[in-house]
Amino acid sequence: MLGDGNGGMSTIPGFNQIQFEGFCRFIDQGLAEELYKFPKIEDRDQEIEFQLFVETYQLVEPSIKERDAVYESLTYSSELYVSGGLIWKNSRDMQEQTIFIGNIPLMNSLGTSIVNGIYRIVINQILQSPGIYYRSELNHNGISVYTGTIISDWGGRVELEIDKKARIWARVSRKQKISILVLSSAMGLNLREILENVCYPEIFLSFLSDKEKKKIGSRENAILEFYQQFTCVGGGPVFSESLCKELQKKFFQQRCELGRIGRLNMNQRLNLDIPHNNTFLLPRDILAAADHLIGMKFGMGTLDDMNHLKNKRIRSVADLLQDQFGLALIRLENVVRGTICGAIRHKLIPTPQNLVTSTPLTTTYESFFGLHPLSQVLDRTNPLTQIVHGRKSSYLGPGGLTGRTASFRIRDIHPSHYGRICPIDTSEGINVGLIGSLTIHAKIGHLGSLESPFYEISARSKKVRMLYLSPNRDEYYMIAAGNCLALNRGAREEQVVPARYRQEFLTIAWEQVRLRSFFPFQYFSIGASLIPFIEHNDANRALMSSNMQRQAVPLARSEKCIVGTGLERQVALDSGVPAIAEHEGKIIYTDIDKIILSGNGYTVSIPLVMYQRSNKNTCMHQKTQVQRGKCIKRGQVLADGAATVGGELALGKNILVAYMPWEGYNFEDAVLISERLVYEDVYTSFHIRKYEIQTHVTSQGPERITNEIPHLEAHLLRNLDKNGIVMLGSWVETGDILIGKLTPQLAKESSYAPEDRLLRAILGIQVSTSKETCLKLPTGGRGRVIDVRWIQKKGGSSYNPETIRVYILQKREIKVGDKVAGRHGNKGIISKILPRQDMPYLQDGAPVDMVFNPLGVPSRMNVGQIFECSLGLAGSLLDRHYRVAPFDERYEQEASRKLVFSELYEAGKQTGNPWVFEPECPGKSRIFDGRTGDPFEQPVIIGKPYILKLIHQVADKIHGRSSGHYALVTQQPLRGRAKQGGQRVGEMEVWALEGFGVSHILQEMLTYKSDHIRARQEVLGTTISGRTIPKPEDAPESFRLLVRELRSLALELKHFLISEKNFQINRKEV
């Protein structure tokens, strides 16, 4: 609960609420809507009819728990049962049975689904809302061309445009356009009806030529003309029923189905009163749209802003799941129809249960969760990442935009985003502005609109009422800006306040204000709301910080931030990472893996998460925070999870930082750190890596898991048990065998070694023909084996192979090359780890932990880090924690600076250290060089900011290649760490080597180490024998490739060798 002096208390909604509401809407309404659309299915002779009785459908509780579904790589789903019946029309007999339709993946308490043991989340998509939109564009002559675009529910478009002669055309594709009269006639109207239903009949008559009259003389002629233009068919097509069906399928069903939202928008924009259940485009819509277009041409009416959120709709998890359910039912309908026909053909008596199979529904949802762009693997790097992932909004995906084609205008911040989509939190790179994040209080309305809350200010009533407004409603109100939140009641009448009205910012009297913002975080997403003093930062750096907080690694010893924003507790609780008491009671037992709680006549065992791997290889682990015998209340934290302390988010550490240059080691965002951070495990984190292997049944027989692997050294097999699987608790190094596996193979007589053939001939011993295919620990994987899982799928066929997974725990201290960052976009790479005695130290002798470059502050304009740094120092000395809401200048000018300086002054006074606050240079202090003991020339800013260690770690990225694979075409080393690739020496690198004059190294780079096949083969032999490496004589493979490409363009490339003696030309082919 956070409150404001004038607005009373307001509760922040649950951060997973959007996902929960969407899934509940799908279960309660979406399932029934799609089941009602399922048709009655008859056989060809119309003797048997099959139908579903939708009134009684039920979902069964899952037979497995969430944790077991993850462990065994299963789907956490519920079985759907519907009553169905077969009716024999001749005898009027009916057979009714309960039918199993299929499995529907359920949503868990985190707002995610578990599919094949993987946490997946469906993100919200922003689409253009169906309806009609008018806009004006300048043509190549500089004349305004007015168009009206009708967008269907499926994304299809029909454009109406008016030319300089006031003729109206309907454009059904980019190249083809037809007269509005032809389109109206093809939709069923004659000329008299057209003229009676328009406001400007004289304009329609003005472009009615004799040729046009012939085209619309009958509906058949109009349909033929429309078909010819739409399909670009030459000649004279003949009118037929099949032609009408093709036009109906290709044009009217795809481009003319408006849907419920489109019909509402169409009625509202064109002032129509067509019933809402009539969801297809009608001739009346076309004529009304043409009338509005003519009015636009003559200066009447307003153009539409396509990027305004009132013209967008949110396609939530409910809509996506409902679409997939409808698709599955269409597939099921085809299956049932085929099964009925087959049963009658073979003279079998079908039953409802025999007709229906669960395959269509199950496979549809599996492919949706596995392949759909909006269904993503849940990012579980830390608790914040889990929460933010479900609140993303994307313009990308089916029916949406692409990163290559989206314009700057779409990516830009729009005034209607205020309080709905965060103006800061978006992705970096090609998708900037296309993937955003919903604000804290935003919610999705009934028709897919994004709603934001406001307080209603009423002169009559003293009660404050909260309203949720959609984007098309709030622009009609005078809304007071957020900086007038703290005005006291007495002074309000005399105040002139800034307000927002119709996307403009005005200054008005308080009496004119109808609504006001009610929460400091209302405009920001969760990630941006966790940045203290965000108002003092440049927005670009705040964007980086929002993204980098999601990359923070949970540390072994987490610590709460001294300076926060007050949102840390709710983020941690809603993420589901800490264990929370659901009932009040008494703790009767605690252990490392469970807590037992006793209440009024019941006993509950609460299992704890033990060293669970996230999909980013971070360690999820819960630690008990309650003691045996204690009484607890409902909602109390029982156990902290990864990156939480006391139920609050704790992503990093409060460490002592100085902003100063140090021997060039913090040049260009490099960071200098003390060895204390390594030896005291300040930034030590645990990572769990997963390695798996499968056993198949091959044509030569089944693969075997065994510890008897021939031709391998004994020390590589030292950790295997008698079954050939690595033992729990073993310490494994690179190259060790984790799972011993032999694959049978067919051996020919010629493939046997001579000694094998001798053994067979003399002793009759059958030599093993198995190939060693063991699971070996790759480079950089050393650690402790903490878990081995043997997953056996049901059936045990070769299509369902057995899987063995090995989980290895790694302990990683901070090292040179790791990435660290603050909460203000101030990021850097560790450049050197200094002994603590060499680090600069304060006047009380405390050595600094980290040294940042001071030049990184003024140019980046992220001054918030300086406020946090100084306030953190005061908090550590006073043993206080601060929770500062953003934009505190609304209370008084320079509020942030006054708070920081007053706390620093108090800290210096209470601790007896006057250097903490020196009036000549507040926030700065004189510090000393640890190597010499001499003071530095200038005072330095010191403090305790909150610094995070990010997932970008040098252990995952450092790579070296001695030998490896080559590309087939260019014969050059492959690219990338995963392929054991090499570092490319490109054009600029060649220039650099030329600049140093290292000709031999350059020749090696371009020949032996790259694509000179013969030369690199000779290098190994000459190196072993000690001979001189021969110089490459002919051209490398890349040059040969160039010649071949030129030959493919009919350009023959040859070079000539001219003799010095007689200048006789000897031709030599390349």
UniProtKB/Swiss-Prot annotation:
Q: Does the keyword rRNA processing apply?
A: no
Compartments annotated for it: namely: Plastid, Chloroplast
Query: By its UniProt entry, which PROSITE patterns does this protein fall under?
Result: RNA_POL_BETA
Q: Which UniProt keywords apply?
A: Chloroplast, DNA-directed RNA polymerase, Nucleotidyltransferase, Plastid, Transcription, Transferase
Subunit record text? In plastids the minimal PEP RNA polymerase catalytic core is composed of four subunits: alpha, beta, beta', and beta''. When a (nuclear-encoded) sigma factor is associated with the core the holoenzyme is formed, which can initiate transcription.
Q: Which family does it belong to?
A: Belongs to the RNA polymerase beta chain family.
What name does the UniProt record give this protein?
A: DNA-directed RNA polymerase subunit beta
